[in-house]
Amino acid sequence: MMNMKTAFVTGATGLLGNNLVRELIAKGCRVKALVRSLEKGRRQFGSVEGVELIAGDMTDVAAFASHLQGCDVLFHTAAYFRDNYKGGSHWPELKAINVDGTERLLEQAYRAGIRRFVHTSSIAVLNGEPGMPIDETCLRRSEDADDYYRSKILADEVVLAFLQSHPDMNGSLVLPGWMWGPADLGPTSSSQLANDVMNGKLPGLVPGSFSVVDARDVALAMILAAERGKRAERYLAAGRHMTMQQLVPLLGKIAGVQTPKRTLPLPLLYIIAALQEAYARLSGKPILLSLATVRLMVKEANRSHFNHAKSERELGLTFRPVEQTIGDTVAWLRNNAAES
């Protein structure tokens, strides 16, 4: 087992990042947590001991690089992902943060003496035939990718190129699915969906399938990858294949609310998405359905069966029941709503 006395975590207030910080603290590790907002960092980690908040942004890695000194391992979870979430095109931000920011972070970590890192990749870098199991070897071509997917593919290429040119640096890549779980201050699309279901705002079911995973299980996968992962290897942490027709009724049952039964036709989904994007532009608020999301659902339908044999064999990774994940997500959202 490697020495992990002090870890540096980017994206620390995010759904994955904050759960990773908590898991590291529970294992006796000190954590330097990169946050864009100290206020949000204090809100997320107010009562957690062993966390040092570092204010910084992935668009200016040099500004926080001195804090990488003295760390044993780097966990990179920060990413810009709103291309599929807020609507519109965000390629400059996607490239600046997900691609260029990753490269600069690795360069600064190496200069600071860090020789072990775990990079958060995505199932977006993989592709396969509908209904067939997809593993870490099923790589997606960048020309078969939207802007967000392309940014994750290019980020992986940056990571692997860095490892090739720095033979004394060790790094692994973890590929999460659609993450759910508690402490989602964002909120990300999973908590947005849960809130919409609980508040009766979901007009109907959408077609398509997803791979649902607990952010806490992904956090454990990151730690296991740091401890046991092989150099320059990808490890899936995608979770369980589910259709929206399975997920929403389960969410309703656990939350104790009625859920829609009908599946919305695709032409209507495109109209709703266009209207939501217009609303997002006017209000600046996140939306559940963007045009990019609808296109993605159509393109990726039934391409969410992932084979975790490698992660199970080499990392010892397991997943908690999806019912527990949804239950904990709902409970946290309700408690958080009551407090705010």
Sequence positions of predicted segments:
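Conserved Rossmann-fold NAD(P)-dependent oxidoreductase catalytic core, especially the SDR/UDP-sugar
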Residues: 96-148
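Glycine-rich "substrate-gating" loop/helix at the edge of Rossmann-like oxidoreductase active sites
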Residues: 145-146, 177-186, 203-216
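NAD(P)H-binding glycine-rich loop region in Rossmannoid oxidoreductase-like domains
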Residues: 47-100, 108
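Glycine/proline-rich active-site loop of Rossmann-fold NAD(P)-dependent oxidoreductases
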Residues: 167-169, 181-192, 225-235, 257-259
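Active-site Tyr-X1-5-Lys
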Residues: 145-172
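N-terminal Rossmann NAD(P)H-binding glycine-rich loop of SDR-like oxidoreductase domains
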Residues: 5-27
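Substrate-positioning beta->alpha
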Residues: 104, 189, 206-227, 233
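Mid/C-terminal beta-alpha module of Rossmann-like enzyme folds, strongest
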Residues: 221-289, 308, 313-314, 323-340
